[in-house]
């Protein structure tokens, strides 16, 4: 696949940004220690897995991306649209063990160096933000709830520079095979973007939704230039050899870790 995300042993990396001091990527599912499912490279401490496995996977990833895990930050995601400002004082949060810190946070941003923002995914959309000019990075977790409540708009509220200097990467997530019902479709039709561009009716109370397209449209609507938005072709629901899919695997699966940091 011709994509800006390039395969590595346990992750995909947005390779062209490395020379700009940006480490941006997402883990893949295979060649791990977890039994959930077998040989999974699960990165979530909050599912049925041994803590030892997660720690070993963290250490493996830290070595592969050359970003010490002591500098990682992980929030407790709740499918909302709250955004947290992260500083070096937050490094290590929820990495060795889960705590009450950063609870209810589904997006983070920082202007600090040597901080790796991380969150878990298994169909929801990882949205990465960066500006090398202004030394800004952010990461958002956008499932259908986060997309509908415009979590990308909430992140943009914390950008204190011209949006023409901001770049956004929309990472691997479910494809338009993801379906919603009438009630959820009606919610999306209240957004300030044309739902016909990302929702397709397939039958009674059945509508396919492309959450990647929806988030890209919202970003553009709120001022991010189209040419500054990159959307990967990788999809969790179409590439099960690489990714976990909560919906296709009926919840019995692991989680990938999306990450972004700057040197």
From Swiss-Prot:
Q: Which SUPFAM superfamilies match?
A: CNF1/YfiH-like putative cysteine hydrolases
Which residues make up the binding site for Zn(2+)?
79, 124, 141
Cofactor(s) this protein cannot do without: Cu(2+); Zn(2+)
EC number per UniProt = 2.4.2.1, 3.5.4.4, 2.4.2.28
Give the stretches traversing the membrane.
none
Q: Which UniProt keywords apply?
A: Copper, Hydrolase, Metal-binding, Oxidoreductase, Transferase, Zinc
Q: What does this protein do?
A: Purine nucleoside enzyme that catalyzes the phosphorolysis of adenosine and inosine nucleosides, yielding D-ribose 1-phosphate and the respective free bases, adenine and hypoxanthine. Also catalyzes the phosphorolysis of S-methyl-5'-thioadenosine into adenine and S-methyl-5-thio-alpha-D-ribose 1-phosphate. Also has adenosine deaminase activity.
- Subunit text: Homodimer.
Q: Which NCBIfam families match?
A: peptidoglycan editing factor PgeF
What is this protein called in UniProt?
Purine nucleoside phosphorylase SAS1121
Its ancestry begins with:
Bacteria, Bacillati, Bacillota, Bacilli, Bacillales
């Amino acid at each position: 696949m011709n994509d800006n995300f390039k395969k590595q042993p346990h992750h995909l990396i947005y390779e062209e940004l490395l020379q700009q001091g940006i480490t941006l990527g997402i883990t893949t599912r295979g060649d791990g220690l977890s039994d959930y499912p077998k040989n999974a490279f699960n990165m979530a401490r909050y599912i049925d897995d041994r803590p030892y496995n997660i720690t070993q996977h963290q250490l493996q990833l830290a070595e592969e991306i050359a970003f010490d895990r002591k500098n990682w930050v992980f929030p407790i995601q709740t499918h909302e649209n709250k955004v947290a400002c992260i500083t070096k004082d937050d490094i290590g949060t929820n990495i060795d063990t889960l705590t009450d810190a950063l609870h209810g946070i589904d997006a983070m941003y920082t202007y600090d160096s040597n901080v790796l923002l991380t969150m878990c995914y298994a169909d929801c959309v990882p949205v990465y933000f960066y500006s090398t000019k202004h030394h800004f990075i952010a990461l958002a977790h956008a499932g259908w709830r986060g997309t509908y409540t415009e979590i990308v708009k909430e992140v943009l509220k914390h950008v204190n520079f011209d949006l023409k200097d901001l770049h956004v990467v929309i990472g691997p997530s479910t494809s338009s095979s993801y379906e919603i019902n009438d009630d959820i479709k009606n919610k999306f039709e209240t957004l300030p973007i044309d739902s016909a561009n990302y929702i397709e009716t397939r039958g009674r109370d059945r509508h396919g939704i492309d959450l990647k397209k929806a988030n890209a449209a919202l970003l553009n609507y709120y001022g991010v230039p189209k040419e500054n938005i990159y959307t990967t072709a990788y999809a969790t629901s179409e590439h099960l050899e690489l990714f976990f899919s909560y919906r296709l695997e009926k919840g019995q699966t692991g989680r990938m870790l999306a990450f972004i940091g700057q040197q």
